[in-house]
Amino acid sequence: MLRIATGVRAARLWSALVGLASLLALGGQASAQTEQQDVVNAAETTFSNFMRDPDMTWLQRHLSSAKAVLIAPQVVKAGWILGGSGGRAVLFARNEQTGRWEGPAFYNLATASVGFQAGIAVSETVTLVTTEKGLNSLLATSAKLGGDASIAAGPVGAGANADITTDFVAFSRSKGIYGGVNLDGTVISVADGWNHAYYGRPVLPTDILLTAHAHNPQADRLAEALSRAASTNTSMR
């Protein structure tokens, strides 16, 4: 009975978390396309914040060699004994021939946890996808970080320098009562409905990220910011 009750509580908590994350991330907008563009615009702000942060030099130096970058402008983490986190993210993949960043493909992030925890935190995260295995895992319907692909927290500090061989390297900035988001164990799933709404037709992540058969000019500014940052920071490595 205790196990059943705990499961029910976890399900209810997770439903509340997802609802809270959606409200925060979407800003209560009624238009689906406006909702997606809001996330793209917020992702651009997040990316700019990380590129200006003197503690994110490892991220800045290694952006140019990444296969892709996953930007989550708002990940909500909350809990009381049972907890979890959730949010929306956009993924851009780097075309190795042209250097252009193709995207965005929209994804959902979800994590559940059990253990002593209390409070709420809101984070913005930028995750480098450093291997083909990591990128391929995101082209599937869903992937579990730390399971289907390896992940490490990125080095932070003005002089941070480390050799990391995981498929994903995650960086986060948080504000809240307790610690920031740990993406290990996070399930990343393709937001098919959001991709459909943003591009006006059913599309797969491969259509958006690899073949460039889907394009929305409203995301060009973020794609260009990625290209500029990667080009500018190549000499830092």
Protein language model regions, located:
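Sec/Tat signal peptide C-region and signal peptidase I cleavage site
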Residues: 26-32
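N-terminal secretory signal peptides that target proteins for export/translocation
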Residues: 1-10
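Small-residue-enriched, tightly packed secondary-structure blocks
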Residues: 33-237
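N-terminal non-cleavable signal-anchor helices
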Residues: 9-11, 19, 41, 47
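Bacterial N-terminal signal peptides
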Residues: 14-25
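Hydrophobic alpha-helical segments, especially transmembrane helices
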Residues: 10-13, 74
